[in-house]
Amino acid sequence: MEKKWWKESVVYQIYPKSFKDSNGDGVGDIRGIIQKLDYLKELGVNVLWISPMLESPQDDNGYDISDYRRIYEEYGTMEDYEELLCEAHKRSIRILMDLVVNHTSDEHNWFIESRKSKDNPYRDYYIWKDPVNGKEPNNWGGAFGGSAWEYDPQTQMYYLHLFSKKQPDLNWENEKVRQEVYDMMKFWCEKGIDGFRMDVISMISKDQRFPDGEMNNGLYGDFGPYSVHGPRVHEFLQEMNHEVLSKYDIMTVGETAGVTIEEAQKYAGEDRNELNMVFQFEHVESGCGDYGKWTTQKYDFKEFKNIMIKWQEKLQGKAWNSLFLGNHDQPRSVSRFGNDNPVYRETSAKMLATCIHMMQGTPYVYQGEELGMTNVYFDKLEDYRDIESINYFEEFTESGLMTPEHMMKCLMLRSRDNARTPMQWDAVSYTH
């Protein structure tokens, strides 16, 4: 396989809101990241993947972008970001931007215009459908609970949102949308970024029939077969590669939930002209129950081991592996795959790190993983901020699918908030 710098790198993911607060306002920021660049250099990090720092109402903690060319004010300014790029590059650290283009915020100007009227020039930037028998266009459920469709009284139509209702899906069938995305990507490449981590990129192509999904355990149909690895996804990515990616010496990794070995080879095959690598989630989904991640069921170690071996063997010489156990969407790896009892926490963390760093592929370290940070185990719903956790708690308990007590145990084990607590820079106890 061809030698590339990203094959020899160690990537460190920063969740900016909770990484380092430089001004005491309780929110992590860009200047805080700059302050810790020497620490990251000493740690052996070559690439920083930073979760979204662009303008956003923060409904989904920045994965709902309202302006693709502005920095979120609480994180800093464009000048701060440019300084971060400069200072990181001085230390031979590259910067990977989180690219969120399956959807925008409903407060993005494109959507504000789109919902005004059926003949607005931005109408087809999003996916609008008429009601069917006075109800949603199909039975799809959203990834964060509830229906994937939201009724808009202004034009008496529904718009699609595979995530929060404040995250309307872009219509990638529209060539103008794709060009807007490519122009924005070029803007950031010209700023000097070194690549993109592409959020839920496998969902940008939808089956244009929009059929009902299969009813699994739950209240809504599964959108997966019709919106994940859709009919034109590889065409779109090859176009993106031709228009943008091939013109820069950058690294790309796509978030591709549910990807198979065969699909991964399509996304990241060296002769495919799409992405450099993908995130597969088979290993972190090991042990999921009837309601997906919301379970107290433990993972099977042998199954986990076999999954890791399979991906190593099947991608050998065909595509490049991304190696990770945790990120901003996963519970803490020590709590999930090791033992976070104080007696075993450190040993578990070292064992898991050894596992990841000794395999072939590019390893990704999530902030705090190097310290063996653990789940937080909040036992009250009001302590949670994650929209996914809150929505599913309400949906599952109100429908009777789970008792509040059982669902709370699921949140304690699986909520995304477990990974989003403040980075533990010292041993000082925090009190309200």
Regions found by a protein language model. Name each.
Residues 1-430:
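Active-site and adjacent substrate-binding regions of carbohydrate-active enzymes
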